[in-house]
A protein has these predicted regions:
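N-terminal subdomain of nucleotide-sugar transferases
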Residues: 1-43, 75, 213
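Active-site proximal beta-strand in glycosyltransferases
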Residues: 3, 96-116
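Conserved catalytic-core segment of nucleotide-activated headgroup transferases in glycan assembly
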Residues: 21, 171-235, 245, 249-250, ...
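Membrane-proximal helix-turn-helix segments that form the acceptor-binding/catalytic region
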Residues: 66, 110, 124-145
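Donor nucleotide-sugar binding/catalytic pocket of nucleotide-sugar-dependent glycosyltransferases
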Residues: 136, 140-179
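Acidic donor-binding loop of glycosyltransferase active sites
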Residues: 257-271, 282-284
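Short hydrophobic beta-strand element within catalytic cores of glycosyltransferases
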Residues: 275-281, 285-289
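A charged, aromatic-enriched C-terminal amphipathic alpha-helix characteristic of glycosyltransferases
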Residues: 324-354
Length: 357
């Protein structure tokens, strides 16, 4: 079976949450079928502006449509896997012109995300309308829709009157080697709390809230690691002298290894938080909000703690830091049982069987 996989993610750049989920999809499909990758690169030219007239989401152009059209003519794909719900225009074009199945993966409910942004940036209101239109097209023309969790499944059904056929949660390729844990460094240094996430609004607002409302009363240093956070390094570090902003890194592993625990003060969003699965993979204790744990089948107290206020973060984390355990065997077990790539491979196999009929 031959499949065309369409994505906006660059798998060769600095990894982030979005690219990790997309790369997982591509890798597992490639193990099961003959998959061609089509990378939608953002272009600023006449095609980009003309595409807005046709209600393609910004960044998707008529030129992209033409290139996908040519690939479909040449290769005669059995299915097109659209790795974002913002590809509604592509879904519509494919279904009207070619006799092949269309699968759409909703990494979250994008219209909800842009609606949230539009409250703080009027220009994002336009993006919200394009996202709404694109997701409506996806739900109309896709043969199969995949969501991360039941919350997104329910939200999409409410908004577009279409329920997703499959649930595939966030998972990771297991890269953890327990022997690499630097126990000597952990015993000698002041405990480090780790926040991991790329620089976008919910992450920025969440970690800034934590710095202002919890960190002053917690007996540890905070490190912030994630693509783009170096942009606000001096702004954030000025808020507390127990804070170090690292920003973009090529490898996240050393930071997880040396951290006593992970904090996830996320209050807005949809989908599942990719960095939660990553923290579980490394066997790290996690203190997070309800939003951070959303979609994960886990005992929050065994994982670390469910904290939604500054006081809850301070109490739970200071108690943990009295005798920090750098390796949480429960979290590691949950990862192996539910959030390792091998646990969802059978679902992709089932999807491929369905699109081949």
């Amino acid at each position: 079976m031959k499949i065309l996989f369409v994505t906006k993610q660059d798998y060769h750049g600095v990894p982030n949450g979005g690219s990790a989920g997309s790369k997982r999809n591509f890798q597992l499909l490639s193990e099961l079928a003959d998959v061609d990758l089509y990378h939608i690169k953002t272009r600023k030219n006449l095609f980009a502006y003309l595409s807005l007239i046709f209600m393609y989401f910004p960044g998707i152009t008529l030129q992209h449509i033409q290139e996908i059209n040519q690939k479909c003519k040449d290769e005669k794909y059995s299915a097109i896997f659209l790795d974002a719900s913002l590809f509604g225009g592509i879904a519509k074009y494919i279904k009207r012109k070619f006799n092949c199945k269309v699968v759409v993966f909703f990494h979250n409910c994008e219209s909800d995300y842009f609606k949230m942004l539009s409250k703080k940036n009027i220009i994002k209101s336009l993006y919200y309308l394009y996202a709404l239109f694109s997701e409506r097209q996806c739900t109309k023309y896709a043969d199969i829709i995949i969501t991360l969790n039941r919350r997104d499944q329910k939200r999409i059904a409410e908004e577009y009157l279409r329920k997703s056929e499959y649930l595939i949660p966030v998972t990771f390729e297991d890269k953890f080697i327990k022997q690499k844990m630097n126990r000597q460094k952990q015993l000698c240094n002041e405990p480090v709390i780790l926040f991991v996430g790329s620089f976008f609004l919910p992450n920025y607002e969440g970690v800034k809230w934590f710095i202002e409302n919890a960190l002053p009363l917690i007996s540890a240093k905070l490190q912030i690691v994630g693509k783009g956070f170096e942009k606000v390094k001096y702004e954030l570090e000025a808020l507390n002298d127990k804070l170090e902003v690292i920003g973009t890194v090529q490898s996240i592993e050393p930071y997880y290894t040396d951290a006593a625990c992970v904090v996830m003060p996320i209050f807005e969003g949809s989908g599942m938080k990719v960095k939660m699965a990553e923290a579980l993979m490394y066997g790290k204790t996690v203190f997070g909000t309800k939003e951070a744990f959303e979609g994960y089948e886990i005992d929050c107290q065994k994982a670390g703690g469910l904290c939604n206020t500054g006081e809850e973060f301070v109490t739970a984390m200071n108690q943990f830091l009295k005798n920090p355990v750098y390796y949480n065997s429960y979290n590691r077990q949950i990862f192996m049982e539910k959030y390792s790539n091998s646990n969802v491979k059978t679902i992709f196999e089932e999807i491929l069987r369905e699109v081949s009929t």
